[in-house]
Structure formats: C-alpha cells, structure tokens
C-alpha cells in the first residue's frame, strides 16, 4: 500500500507543471508569427518592438467562445491600463477567420497569428496552452510577471499591472 501511494505521489509531482518561468525559452522566442499584413516575425522581434512597456498577451482564436466572452473584461483592462501594450496572439489556422474576428469584435491592440494553431509550435508548447483564452503579463524589463491566467477578469492581472 505504501508503495502504491509513493507511486501515485511521484506521478502527481512529476506530471504537474509547478514551474512559473520569468523568461521565455530560446525556442519560444524563435517561433514564427505573422502580422495582419502577413509579414513574418520571430516572437522575440515582436517583443522587442514593445521593450520598456508592460505587455498583456492574450492567446485567443476567433472560434473560441470563451475568448469572445472575455473581450468585455479585456476591454475594461484596456480602459483601466491604457499605457499597457495589448498583444493578441491568435491560434486561428484560418487567416481570414482571424482577420474577420479582429474586425467583427473590434479588438484593439497588436495582432499576430501563430500559423500552426494551438497544437504545435515552440511558443504554445512553452506556454503549455491547453485552453484558451490564456493571458500572460510581461513587465517593462521583459520579465514574465504572470505566467497563466485563463480569464481577463482574473484579479492577478490587475495586481501585476499595478505592481510591476
């Protein structure tokens, strides 16, 4: 019985992701993104454009009901923290659907597409994206201050935006 408990505890401890990284991996930074004009960037190039600013990353898709439901709360964050850069990373595999979603839902911010979608790619692997929406906050120094939030209304988002 003790051996079974030890095995179960080992499995739980090794399968859960307790890591809360403060920096993106080299592989994630090298992942490819496209802007709405279909210009190719590495994730690192995108982040460098906003160096010195706080960034809220929203990993979303036009087909995602929870993503769309969270937009009013995200727009409220934008109202409360207008100095923050809002970086929308879409996992839509259909580029036209992604662009229509931006227009239809009137999403203001910086928009990029992860062309491999939610199941593949170094950045989605690094973020361990198994559900969207997913929010990540980066401070002015490029440090990840909030690694995982699944709702725009998560109080931790506001907390790190105020404190960092």
Residue ranges and their predicted role:
Residues 53-55, 59-63, 131:
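Short pre-active-site segment immediately N-terminal to redox-active cysteine/selenocysteine motifs
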Residues 57, 87-89, 136:
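Conserved hydrophobic packing residues within short motifs/helices of P-loop NTPase cores
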Residues 1-37, 164:
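N-terminal targeting signals for export/organelle localization
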Residues 59-76:
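Conserved redox-active cysteine motifs that mediate thiol-disulfide chemistry
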Residues 33, 79-119, 129:
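Conserved segment of the thioredoxin-like fold in thiol-based oxidoreductases
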Residues 107, 116-162:
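Thiol/disulfide oxidoreductase modules built on the thioredoxin-like
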Residues 31-55, 72:
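A short beta-strand-turn-helix
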């Amino acid at each position: 019985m003790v051996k079974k408990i030890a095995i179960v505890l080992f499995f739980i401890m090794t399968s859960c992701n307790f890591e809360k990284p403060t920096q993106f991996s080299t592989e994630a930074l090298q992942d490819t993104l496209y802007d709405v004009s279909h210009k190719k960037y590495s994730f690192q190039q995108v982040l460098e454009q906003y160096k010195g600013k706080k960034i809220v990353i929203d990993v979303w898709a036009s087909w995602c009901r929870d993503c769309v439901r969270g937009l009013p709360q995200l727009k409220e964050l934008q109202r409360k923290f207008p100095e923050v850069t809002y970086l929308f990373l879409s996992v839509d595999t259909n580029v036209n659907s992604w662009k229509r979603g931006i227009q239809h839902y009137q999403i203001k911010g910086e928009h990029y597409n992860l062309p491999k979608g939610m199941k593949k790619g170094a950045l989605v692997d690094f973020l361990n994206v198994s559900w969207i929406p997913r929010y990540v906050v980066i401070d002015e120094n490029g440090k990840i201050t909030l690694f995982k939030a699944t709702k725009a209304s998560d109080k931790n988002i506001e907390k790190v935006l105020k404190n960092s």
